[in-house]
């Protein structure tokens, strides 16, 4: 084998290992616990409970490296259910509450560059969350909320598989934390907007470089930042439509490469660079029950699968 062939073979191995590690510890899903829907930042009265169920579908038809290179013959289909329970309880004079989120479902048809990632079914790491409104002014239709999320690594994980559901909600297989700040502003009787920023923190993990190679490496993911925006128009008291944006920045992930620079090198495995357009319509069928339908599409991606089409169907029940 020539030097060029050896280099090409090594590069191919590292690419396959990087992609496998993205799937193994980084998550390839269409769901995120801190992903907001329109008017979520308006607090409910103290003592209110809300049960929310989501069906989420994602069709991913291309994969992009961290340098922006498109890898052809790549795909992933995602079908998930997400159960979310929210309880509101004032803290002093400030609205506040707690929530728990549990995602389950399947990822199938996974492949990158023609190499199969297989399929998986299971549950994601549970999301535990608390939130509070340090400022809420119903007279001015202004609301400022701060929320925290914690993801203990309790989801479905098998180091022998490329795809694992454990990371599908938090974006990481190991311990993950998130701090989110959100603002809702109503302007006139019909228009409102929601804006949020959040930063995620990820704990290091260890695991095989590939499911079929028992070589353990340390995996690291830098913190990432996400920005979200919804512009909402209420056509009636019950029916609203919205257009939105979601963007991820940073979040580079890598593993310590044992065969590069004497074990001191790094191999990039992914990033949280993504820009998504969203559109939603919601309808209250009764004062307690709401339906929401959302469609979305990634307009740019780096360090993961690019979602060609995403669908969200949400039911919300207030009691």
Give the location of each predicted region.
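Outer-membrane beta-barrel biogenesis signature
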Residues: 28-52, 60
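Outer-membrane pore/translocation modules
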Residues: 105-220, 269
């Amino acid at each position: 084998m020539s030097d060029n062939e050896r280099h090409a073979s090594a590069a191919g191995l590292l690419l396959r290992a990087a992609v496998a590690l993205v799937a193994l510890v980084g998550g390839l899903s269409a769901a995120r616990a801190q992903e907001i829907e329109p008017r979520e930042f308006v607090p409910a009265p103290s003592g209110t409970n809300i049960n929310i169920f989501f069906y989420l579908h994602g069709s991913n038809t291309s994969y992009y490296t961290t340098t922006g290179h498109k890898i052809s013959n790549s795909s992933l289909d995602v079908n998930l259910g997400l159960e979310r329970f929210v309880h509101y309880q004032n803290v002093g004079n400030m609205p506040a509450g707690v929530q728990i989120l549990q995602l389950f479902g399947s990822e199938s048809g996974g492949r990158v560059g023609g190499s199969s990632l297989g399929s998986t079914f299971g549950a994601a790491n549970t999301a535990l969350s608390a939130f509070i409104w340090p400022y809420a002014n119903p007279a001015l239709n202004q609301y400022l909320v701060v929320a925290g999320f914690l993801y203990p690594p309790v989801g479905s994980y098998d180091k022998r598989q490329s795809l694992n559901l454990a990371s599908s909600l938090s974006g990481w297989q190991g311990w993950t934390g998130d701090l989110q700040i959100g603002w809702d502003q109503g302007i006139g009787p019909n228009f409102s907007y929601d804006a949020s920023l959040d930063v995620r923190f990820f704990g290091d993990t260890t695991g095989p470089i590939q499911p079929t190679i028992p070589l353990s490496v340390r995996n690291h993911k830098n913190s990432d930042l996400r920005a979200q925006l919804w512009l909402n128009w209420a056509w009636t008291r019950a029916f609203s439509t919205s257009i939105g944006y979601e963007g991820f920045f940073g979040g580079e992930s890598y593993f310590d490469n044992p065969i590069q620079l004497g074990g001191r090198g790094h191999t990039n495995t992914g990033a949280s660079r993504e820009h998504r357009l969203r559109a939603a319509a919601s309808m209250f069928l009764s004062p307690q029950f709401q339906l929401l339908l959302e469609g979305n599409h990634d307009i740019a991606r780096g360090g993961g699968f690019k979602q060609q089409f995403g669908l969200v169907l949400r039911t919300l029940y207030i009691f």
